Design a protein with these regions (language model features):
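Short loop-to-alpha-helix "cap/lid" segments that border enzyme active sites
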Residues: 154-163, 174-193
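Catalytic cores of alpha/beta
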Residues: 145-157, 201-218
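Conserved N-terminal beta1-alpha1 strand-loop-helix module at the mouth
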Residues: 13-99, 140, 148-157, 226
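Conserved, mostly hydrophobic/aromatic
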Residues: 34, 67, 104, 164, ...
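Active-site-adjacent beta->alpha loops and helix N-cap segments on the catalytic face
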Residues: 40-46, 68-76, 92-101, 117-132, ...
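Glycine-rich beta-to-alpha transition loops that act as phosphate-gripper elements at the mouths
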Residues: 85-89, 93-95, 122-124, 142-147, ...
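Glycine-rich phosphate-binding active-site loops on the catalytic face of alpha/beta enzymes
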Residues: 111-121, 161-173, 213-233
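Non-catalytic positions within long, well-ordered alpha-helices that form the structural scaffold/packing
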Residues: 97, 105-106, 134, 154, ...
Length: 244
C-alpha cells in the first residue's frame, strides 16, 4: 500500500490513497492533540491550521493526531497528514461504539496511531488493527515502550514504530536527554527509516539529538498543544528539522 523512496537524503512515504496532501516526508514531527482542551473542537481546528501554516512556511513535514469527533472537519480543512488516535479491530457489523479503519479512511484520515501508552492493545488485537488499517489504505504508526517491544510488533509490519518510554511521557525530561542510547538501539534493531521517538520531546534540541541518533522524526503532545505559545515551539522544532 505504501512505498518509501529517497529524495535528497529525505524519505518520502507515498500512498495511492493519501487523503489530505499527497505524501508524508521524513524526517517528520507528529503532534498528538490527545484530549487536551486546547486540542479539541474549534481549538483543534485552529491548532491544525497553525501546524499546516508552519509546515508550509518552513518547508518541513508535520503531521497531527486528532480525536475521532474532530477528524473529519480537520482532514477536510488542512493539507497535512491527519491521523486518528486509535481504532478497533473490527469491520462493519454489530460492534456498538467501535471505530473501524474503513470509517477512518472515509472521514479523511491519512493514518492511525496505535498502541499508545494511554490506549494500549493486546498483541493479537494490535496485529489485527494493523492489518485492517493497511487494507483500508491507512498509514500505521505503532507505539512501543522499548526497542524490545518494537521487535515484537515489527512482525505485524507497521509503517512506522514510535518508541516512547512511558515514564518520560508528559514529563520535563525528554528521551533524547534521558536515554540517547535507547534511540540508537531502536534504530539499530528496528531499522533506519522505521523509527520515530517520543516522550518528553519539547524543543529543537530534542529534535536535533533524536535525528542525529538516527530517528526519522519525533512524536510529542503537550510540549506543543499545551504550550503558552504553540507557534513559537513549533517554529523551534521545525527549524531543527530543516537541518535534516
Amino acid at each position: 500500500m505504501f512505498k518509501v523512496i529517497n529524495v535528497s537524503d529525505h524519505f518520502i512515504i507515498l500512498s495511492d490513497f493519501y487523503q489530505t496532501g499527497g505524501f508524508m516526508e521524513l524526517p517528520t514531527i507528529i503532534v498528538n492533540f490527545k484530549l487536551y482542551e486546547q486540542g479539541t473542537g474549534d481549538a483543534a481546528l485552529e491548532m491544525a491550521i497553525l501546524h499546516e501554516k508552519i509546515a508550509a512556511e518552513m518547508g518541513v513535514s508535520i503531521a497531527i493526531v486528532v480525536n475521532f469527533l474532530d477528524l473529519e472537519a480537520i482532514a477536510r480543512r488542512v493539507k497535512i497528514p491527519v491521523f486518528a488516535q486509535g481504532m478497533d479491530p473490527v469491520g462493519y457489523g454489530s460492534h456498538t461504539g467501535s471505530i473501524s479503519a474503513d470509517m477512518l479512511f472515509e472521514k479523511g484520515a491519512y493514518g492511525v496511531l496505535l498502541n499508545h501508552a494511554e490506549r494500549p492493545l493486546e498483541y493479537v488485537m494490535l496485529g489485527e488493527c494493523v492489518s485492517r488499517a493497511r487494507d483500508a489504505g491507512l498509514f500505521t504508526v505503532v507505539c512501543v515502550d522499548s526497542p524490545e517491544q518494537g521487535e515484537v510488533v515489527k512482525k505485524y509490519n507497521p509503517d512506522m514504530i514510535a518508541v516512547e518510554p512511558p515514564g518520560l511521557i508528559g514529563g520535563d525530561l525528554s528521551v533524547a536527554e534521558a536515554d540517547p542510547a535507547m534511540i540508537e538501539k531502536a534504530v539499530s534493531e528496528l531499522g533506519r527509516g522505521n523509527v520515530i521517538v517520543g516522550a518528553g520531546i519539547r524543543n529543537g534540541s530534542d529534535v536535533r539529538t533524536s535525528l542525529a541518533l538516527g530517528a526519522s522524526g519525533v512524536l510529542l503532545a503537550s510540549g506543543v498543544v499545551r504550550a503558552d505559545d504553540p507557534e513559537m515551539v513549533l517554529r523551534d522544532l521545525a527549524e531543527a528539522l530543516k537541518r535534516y
